[in-house]
Design a protein with these regions (language model features):
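Short beta-strand-centered segments at strand-helix junctions
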Residues: 16-63, 68-115, 120-152, 158
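Short, positively charged and aromatic/hydrophobic N-terminal segments
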Residues: 2-9
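Catalytic domains of riboflavin
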Residues: 13
């Protein structure tokens, strides 16, 4: 899909928009605990340079329910984070904050269950809406990291 968005310094630009389902980012240490091995198994590349979906999945469990087959994304991070939707949060019985990735203050506690072990961590968030673009494109368009941009999506719900 391609959508238009307006950058005040440039005008109308076209970008591809992707939707990210629930997923998790893990540290190498937590991954080794959950899976009993040290390396992620590459499944497919993501749109973000250097990022990938792994073959590995976990179960996430909250006070009221659980969700299976939550994809682990790579590479390893310096923090553990589970990104869910508002609907997922309701099913799990949690009230996670809307946050930028990596900002875990107030994150909901979730149990992450792998094939070898499990761990409970304050790691559940709803990811704030954001756009991934290359440094070169950001420079060309005159935007910097974390700068708000206006996005207009054509369609019935415009």
């Amino acid at each position: 899909m391609r959508y238009n968005f307006s950058v005040k310094k440039v005008g109308i630009m076209k970008i591809s928009v992707g939707v990210s389902n629930r997923h998790c980012h893990l540290t190498k240490e937590v991954y080794e605990k959950l899976f009993g091995k040290s390396e992620l198994t590459f499944k497919r590349a993501l749109n973000q340079l250097g990022q990938f979906a792994s073959e590995e999945t976990v179960i996430i469990k909250g006070p009221k329910g659980s969700i299976e087959k939550v994809r682990v994304l790579g590479p390893f991070r310096s923090y553990n984070q589970v990104e869910v939707s508002k609907t997922d949060a309701y099913k799990l019985g949690i009230n996670p904050p809307v946050r930028k990735s990596g900002h875990l203050d107030g994150a909901s506690e979730l149990e992450i269950i792998g094939p070898k072990d499990k761990i409970t961590l304050p790691c559940g968030i709803i990811a704030n809406r954001h756009i991934h673009i290359s440094d070169a494109l950001a420079k060309e368009w005159g935007v910097v990291d974390d700068e708000p941009v206006g996005v207009i999506i054509d369609g019935e719900k415009k």
